[in-house]
């Protein structure tokens, strides 16, 4: 949801699915601010978003697809561990559910173009 206000709504799908991993990342956001009003605003926004989205679990099929994702990234000479791991697990979830992956950070998914449709929604 970071940067979502800058995204052209025409670039976004009409039906929204979100990985449980993405939801976990988003859910930590309100706790990163010290201002109570801002924390409440962020929490409300996440809850409203979650109510409209289909949340996709990271399950065994996703774990197996992650192996393919990992190999594809390593084949490009990039590291597939550390901070990048969660993004790659999100990609594996999209692969299993045969969904395109909408992102503001398409470069983070370099090497996965043969496995998944990556939709760059950045300006």
Language-model segments: residues:
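Short, hinge-like loop/turn segments at secondary-structure boundaries
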Residues: 34-37, 74, 119-122
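Short, well-structured N-terminal submotif of metal-dependent ribonuclease cores
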Residues: 1-47
């Amino acid at each position: 949801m970071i940067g979502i206000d800058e995204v052209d709504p025409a670039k976004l799908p009409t039906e929204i699915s979100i990985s449980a991993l993405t939801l976990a990342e988003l859910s930590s956001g309100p706790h990163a601010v010290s201002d109570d009003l801002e924390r409440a605003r962020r929490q409300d926004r996440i809850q409203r978003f979650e109510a409209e989205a289909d949340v996709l679990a990271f399950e065994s099929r996703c774990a197996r697809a992650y192996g393919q994702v990992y190999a594809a990234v390593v084949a490009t000479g990039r590291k597939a561990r550390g901070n990048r791991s969660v993004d790659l697990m999100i990609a594996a979830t999209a692969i299993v559910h045969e969904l395109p992956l909408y992102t503001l950070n398409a470069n983070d998914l370099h090497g996965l173009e043969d496995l998944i449709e990556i939709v760059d929604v950045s300006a």
